Amino acid sequence: MASNMKIKKKSSEKTFDIINGAFLLILVILVAYPLYYVLIASISDPYEVYAGKTFLLPSKITFEGYKRVFKENSIAGGYLNSIYYTVLGTVVSVALVLTTGYCMSKKTLPFRRAIMIFYVITMYVGGVSVYNVIVTRTFFETSIPQELYEAASIDGSGNIRTFVKIALPLAKPIIAVMVIFTMVAYWNDWFTALIYMQEKSRYPLQLVLRQILIQSQAMASMMGNMDGGYAEANKLTELIKFASIVVGSVPMLIAYPFVQKYFEKGFMAGAVKG
């Protein structure tokens, strides 16, 4: 009887594993295929893309889009500017999020509820990401034992020292989550630069790519009356569009695997437990 139960249990477990594996495989395909499609479309003839001939493999391979993108002298400066803005913005933003989240996790903080309401109001006018603050606060409240804070207080440790010596070393997962969230936000931000920056030499990469795409579209419109000119210009515009997506996405795709372990752990600890 017991052996039959074990056989049934093993059979049900195998069935679950097969179904679960199939579901995860489908999910991976749904997430990864759009990225793959953009990559192969960026090196394929646009007419082949429109005809649906690049479903799995590139067709009539061409690198004209990448040549046009990297031909611009502003690309290198755009990359450096984006890296500078992303690193500086991430460091400042994550530092503010961590300190604010740590303070808000203290139930003894005077006017704690009123301050939280104030922060929620600021969601509508920018500043520190309140969502990130809430996730960080939840992490500090639920993932680090309060006894550690109490022991540090008994030993004479102040709030700042407790935060630096105890809370931060144990907060690597949530730090990774905040770094990824903030880096992606700063890396993809072009509208802020469009509003405030006058010098093109200071444009971030996303704005540089936008300018290149707009110029190529304008060129296609100007060549509309020329025989075959519009078709060729429009073809180049499509290549530039796909190439720009790849060029702008590669740095974040490279960075993510290095923090994936901390990202998953921190996101679950900071969100689900709360």
Feature map (PLM): residue ranges:
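A hydrophobic, multi-pass inner-membrane permease signature
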Residues: 2-274
